[in-house]
A protein has these predicted regions:
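Low-complexity, intrinsically disordered segments with a bias for serine/threonine
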Residues: 16, 25-29
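A conserved helix-loop-strand patch within extracytoplasmic ligand-binding domains
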Residues: 138-139, 147-199, 246
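N-terminal glycine-rich phosphate/adenylate-binding segment common to multiple enzyme folds
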Residues: 108-162, 168
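Small-molecule-sensing regulatory modules
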Residues: 2-7, 13-15, 22, 34-112, ...
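Short, well-ordered beta-strand segments
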Residues: 59-61, 95, 134, 152, ...
């Protein structure tokens, strides 16, 4: 298989710049103009060699939001710490790619195509060689991968819970009837309305900073954000309270970062596979098996969470709901924390909810 990484031969700029002084005895001093030409030539070579150092060995593709960039920087830092050649100045380059989901902000995600909105253009850049690896929020990654792309790495998972943010009340339960909660997530909308039918949920898009600004300007009374994102942005001071996973089951793969590359690029596979956190990878695989079985999209409120309990077993909880929250179906499983068993748990849980809900349950 072909490896796409290039390792340029780099001479040390210090070696190039170091010149020996001319001996003073037994020789005629060179004219000053010759000496200047020599210095200029040496300086030019040194600059050229410095430029060679800047040639990146690895290009990371990411969205341009502050959270996406924080995740790309986390990936870069881990690569630099694990591979000395990538710690050289300029060895890793971060390339920002604008996705469909970034361009269309005035419509609900479900109305503009659902899954793949935040990954398609990045995957295309990966396939055409513009970038070498792609950093994704796993909750944005479709259940299928494009041909010739592999995802051999999940970084350690952040906190999966949702944060409640409000300027006047400390929890959803304290909000008066008629209060407006902003959220672009049907998963959050359905669970909020199921527990608190007197509240109103409105579409609320934008990056973390934009949504916090809209909240402070009074567009909504409260909002929910993924605690993982707030932690990665060092913005947890905005959190009013944290919802338990019993009150708000997380999105599939919430808090998990995935790193993808071309399937035939052995060098990149080796780089990023070395960062893989196996416990996270298995949990994400279980949750995505559940999602795949349900054939879920952004039009279907689906939640799921797999984790290792105190005895080392996998516990999985899954949920599907109607967007208005009037119907919520839940299930759970417990079994060995191994890939085959966890894939089976996720699929089996999905089949159960399809059978329970009936074919019409998923036609919204």
């Amino acid at each position: 298989m072909r490896a796409a990484t290039h390792h340029p031969l780099i001479a040390s700029p210090a070696d190039i710049r170091s010149g020996r002084s001319w001996p003073s005895s037994g020789r005629t001093a060179l004219p000053s103009n010759v000496r200047k030409v020599s210095l200029v030539t040496r300086a030019t070579v040194a600059v050229e060699q410095e430029k060679k150092v800047k040639v990146s060995l690895l290009k990371i593709g990411t969205r341009g939001s502050p959270l996406a960039l924080a995740q790309a920087h986390e990936t870069r830092d881990k690569l630099m710490a694990s591979h000395p050649e990538l710690a050289e100045d300029g060895a890793i380059e971060i390339i920002i790619i604008k996705t469909t989901g970034d361009k269309i902000l005035n419509q609900p995600l479900a109305d503009i195509g659902g899954k793949g909105l935040f990954t398609k253009e990045i995957d295309e850049a990966l396939l055409d060689g513009t970038i070498d690896i792609a950093v994704h929020s796993m909750k944005d990654v479709p259940t299928y991968f494009p041909d010739k792309i592999t995802l051999p790495c999940n970084l350690p998972r952040e906190d999966v819970r949702d944060a409640f943010i409000c300027l006047t009340k400390s929890s959803l339960a304290e909000l008066p009837a008629g209060s407006v909660v902003g959220s672009a997530s049907l998963r959050r909308q359905s669970q909020i309305l199921h527990r608190y039918p007197s509240l109103k949920v409105v579409n609320f898009r934008g990056n973390v900073q934009t949504r916090l600004r809209k909240l402070s300007e009074g567009e909504v009374h409260a909002t929910l954000l993924a605690l993982a994102g707030l932690k990665r942005l060092n913005m947890t001071e905005n959190v009013t309270s944290i919802l338990s996973t019993e009150e708000m089951l997380p999105a599939i793969a919430q808090g998990a970062i995935g790193i993808a590359c071309r399937g035939d690029d052995d060098s990149m596979i080796n780089y990023i596979a070395s960062l893989n956190h196996e416990e996270t990878r298995l949990a994400v695989a279980c949750e995505r098996a559940f999602l795949t079985e349900l054939d879920g999209s952004c039009r279907t409120p689906i939640a799921g969470y797999a984790y290792k309990d105190a005895e080392g077993y996998c516990v999985f909880r899954g949920l599907v709901a109607s967007p208005d929250g009037t119907r919520v179906l839940e299930t759970s499983r417990r079994g060995p924390y191994s890939l085959d068993d966890m894939l089976l748990m996720g699929k089996d849980a999905g089949k159960e909810l399809i059978a329970t809900g009936g074919p019409d349950f998923f036609r919204w």
